[in-house]
């Protein structure tokens, strides 16, 4: 990373960025062409390893690409504020972001799918229990285990 003074490698800080993010931009490989999809997500962290959970319809381009090549990139970001400058060169943004690389898997085990959907919903709401039985026949759950992830920030204070 060029601006090492802005790099974040601490797992707790990276998890904070993910918690504050509302969208995961999942990038897939379509031959030599990248394909990026904005998605809802949830995540877990154990011993510094982050696992993402995403959902999808049970068919479509995204799932076809994962089956062909499960290598993915996931990006997250939040613009905290924008500060005008007297000139364009003096304008700046307060932001935080994270980019991770890993492997995607389309889950087939119903318990794993329920866990993934529960994790996903916990990103956006506090209610603990859900009945996913009516969704599982038409919903695919994708698990992405990140091999590496780094963050970057330009903010005045840390959260």
Residue spans for each PLM region:
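Short beta-strand segments
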Residues: 21-58, 74
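Broad gene-expression machinery/nucleic-acid interaction feature
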Residues: 23, 36-38, 71, 95, ...
């Amino acid at each position: 990373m060029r601006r090492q003074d802005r790099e974040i490698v601490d797992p707790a800080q990276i998890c904070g960025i993910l918690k504050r993010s509302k969208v995961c931009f999942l990038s897939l490989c379509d031959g030599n062409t990248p394909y990026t999809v904005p998605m809802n997500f949830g995540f877990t962290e154990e011993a510094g390893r982050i696992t993402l959970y995403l959902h999808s319809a049970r068919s479509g381009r995204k799932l076809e690409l994962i089956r062909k090549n499960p290598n993915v990139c996931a990006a997250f970001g939040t613009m905290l504020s924008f500060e005008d400058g007297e000139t364009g060169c003096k304008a700046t943004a307060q932001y935080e972001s994270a980019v991770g690389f890993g492997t995607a898997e389309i889950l087939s085990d119903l318990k794993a799918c329920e866990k993934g959907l529960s994790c996903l919903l916990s990103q956006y709401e506090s209610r603990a229990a859900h009945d996913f039985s009516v969704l599982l026949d038409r919903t695919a759950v994708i698990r992405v285990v990140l091999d590496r992830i780094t963050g970057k920030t330009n903010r005045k204070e840390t959260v």
